Amino acid sequence: MVISDIRTHLLSVPYRDPPKIGVADYSALEAKINLLVVEVETKSGVIGTGHLHPVAGGMRTLETCIHEMLKPLLIGEEATNVEALWQKMWRATYIQGRMGITVMAMSALDVALWDAVGRHAGKPLWELWGGSGDALPIYGSGCFRGLGHDGMIEKAKRYVDQGYTTIKMQVGHVFTEDEDVANVRDMRQELGSGIGIMLDVNQGWTADEAIRVGSRLDEFDLAWLEEPVVADDFEGYHKVADAIQTPVVGGENHFTHHDFKPFFASRKIPIIQPDIMRGGYTELKVIANQAHDVGIKMAPHLFYQLNSLLNACIPNPMWLEYMGWFDHLWVNPALPENGLLKPPTRPGHGFDFKPELFKEFPYQA
């Protein structure tokens, strides 16, 4: 199954329910769904797809990276040698790469290659990887700080009404410490003791702030405190984890297994959240296995549709994250029921964008 062509498409698609994250750095994310879709075609006629939804722009830069740096490395190669092709791209871009734009571009191609392999075999990826088609636990995300106190609680209650047993709300940034404590207190009172509550700081605090606020929040029996400090502050992560009772988690802004080494060495972060845009399926499987070796669970960031194939076969799955941004974009969306999601049984990763999107919603910078 030799790779014969690689094509890209840039789209700007309206949200059905725009996110209200309430952080200036994420303003581009709130406006529209900017997508880069990549197609890997083989001489046998099989086409695999991958995509990127970066928060901070760079769409044309990512597209250029694919065509200028990576496509020449893959044309004429055997598509089924996915891990070897990942290493070929990694080595060829080592000077400019190792994270950022280059690894994101690699990740989209990696997902597309695996999709092609699954389609060629006529099997869903979880089956190809020796996994199970059983339903997977998924939590309700998107109780955004931009919704305000009442809006966050109302969205969480809608999730509970739909059968979710755990929700995630945001803290920090636009809220004072006292407001954060009041928001979490009221969320707990409204939901009761039987519903898990996760908190997402989006890198909004220093370690000292996280310890001060986190200590006040411990009494609310929280499932986790996510990204309390900036991604590179591993010392801060570990300092916070030592100081509060709530489990500290993170990883969505870390690239490849190399970025996770401090977490694996300390074993103080019990759950990691790698992002499929920062390594693709190939690296996320590596991360999962290395985490499992040191007793750490994995709850991949966003992209619950693609991640369902992964969680179905890794040894240490924890949660999928439901965010319904893409539900109206797929030909056959996967939708949770009562806080559970069954991975698709279609060949490959099983998700195709509606063809009309490519004509109706061209990219708008």
Segments (PLM) and residue ranges:
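Structured beta-strand/loop patches that form or line metal/cofactor-binding pockets in enzymes
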Residues: M1-S44, T49, H53-V55, D327
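Conserved, mostly hydrophobic/aromatic
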Residues: I3, G45, L70, L109, ...
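Shared catalytic-loop signature of beta/alpha-barrel
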Residues: S215, D221, D232-L340, P344-P347
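Hydrophobic faces of well-ordered beta-strands that scaffold small-molecule active sites
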Residues: G48-G50, I138-S141, I167-M169, I197-V201, ...
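Metal- or metallocofactor-binding catalytic centers and their adjacent structured scaffolds
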Residues: E41-H120
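Extended hydrophobic packing segments that form well-structured cores
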Residues: H349-A365
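Glycine-rich, aromatic-flanked loop segments that form ligand/cofactor-binding clefts
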Residues: I101, D110-G146
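Metal-dependent enolase-superfamily TIM-barrel catalytic cores that perform enediolate-based chemistry
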Residues: D134-A243
